[in-house]
Amino acid sequence: MTNKTSLSYKDAGVDIDAGNDLVDRIKGVVKQTRRPEVMGGLGGFGALCALPQKYREPILVSGTDGVGTKLRLAMDLKRHDTIGIDLVAMCVNDLVVQGAEPLFFLDYFATGKLDVDTAASVITGIAEGCKQSGCALVGGETAEMPGMYHGEDYDVAGFCVGVVEKSEIIDGSKVAPGDALVALGASGPHSNGYSLVRKILEVSNTDPEQTQLDGKSLADHLLEPTKIYVKSILSLIEQLDIHAIAHLTGGGFWENIPRVLPQGTQAVIDEASWQWPAVFSWLQETGNVSRHEMYRTFNCGVGMVVALPAELADKAVELLTASGEKAWKIGVIAAAAEGAEQVIINP
């Protein structure tokens, strides 16, 4: 009988000790996100969370998202500390547009070979995003899968659950001609359009770390974390009658604003009401991207659009500005014939 080599999981490329080390590293930052409704801590088979008692008819709202190929850029530039904020932002911003308060968040981190420092940096960013949105990070999955990813490449996904009072759900049904549209400024491209961003960098042979734009590197502009609007929007909803909110993500203006508009209405946007941030002008000029394609791919400096009665528009801008947002009146809702475009951008 020949002696056989004894194989272990680590020999196959999965380091359980590294996974345990990661959990120990992140416990402190995760604890900082805790909400009173959360029961228990990390390590259970499932996370337990009670519904806040202030809701009479609580409706749960859920969402899941990733950060697209912004992640590839972050990996290429070896900047892992803010991509977690992007991940949370993409999920919680989708919830708050329906009037929902984010309750808890879970993440999925998958890699071919677990680098504990990188993973801890990403999850610390996730915890920061949860703190910014008042959301508890209740658990996650770290999957080390040799052969599935190249080297130490990784992917992340986020899952969020929020709650809204049934009578206060914002679904766009109250939108009517004459409503005003108020914009909330974006921090940058957020987490959309990065395949085009990377193509422009490639074709133009641009090094984003060596290219200066408006006083900082292009890399800083492109990796600026997605703005989290949760606290500003929830505060606005408490004080004013909000008819609809659109989160400008993939599909830009053309596809996201119509998602909250009833039939027979259209959003008329005044392009002169704001100036594109420098990064968008650079992308358009360097990539020779058409105006239509820019508005289809990027937020062009507008992270959210709020529809509300015209007489409340000035107050909304005032309240949002007091919350630290850059806000302005960007357009109006008009009546539209059947089959007409639902978004018009007037130069």
Swiss-Prot record:
Q: What is its EC number?
A: 6.3.3.1
Keyword Nucleotide-binding on this protein? yes
Q: Does the keyword Iron apply?
A: no
UniProt keywords (A-Z) are: ATP-binding, Cytoplasm, Ligase, Nucleotide-binding, Purine biosynthesis
Q: Which reaction does it catalyse?
A: 2-formamido-N(1)-(5-O-phospho-beta-D-ribosyl)acetamidine + ATP = 5-amino-1-(5-phospho-beta-D-ribosyl)imidazole + ADP + phosphate + H(+)
Top-level taxon of the source organism = Bacteria
Q: Where in the cell is it found?
A: Cytoplasm
Q: Which EC main class describes this enzyme?
A: ligase
The cellular component terms of Gene Ontology attached to this UniProt record, alphabetical and capped at eight, are:
cytosol
**CDD domains, sorted:** PurM
InterPro entries, per database record: PurM-like_C_dom, PurM-like_C_sf, PurM-like_N, PurM-like_N_sf, PurM_cligase
Sorted alphabetically, the Gene Ontology BP terms of this entry are: 'de novo' IMP biosynthetic process; adenine biosynthetic process
**Which Pfam family, any one of them, does this sequence belong to?**
AIRS_C
Name listed for the protein in its UniProt record: Phosphoribosylformylglycinamidine cyclo-ligase
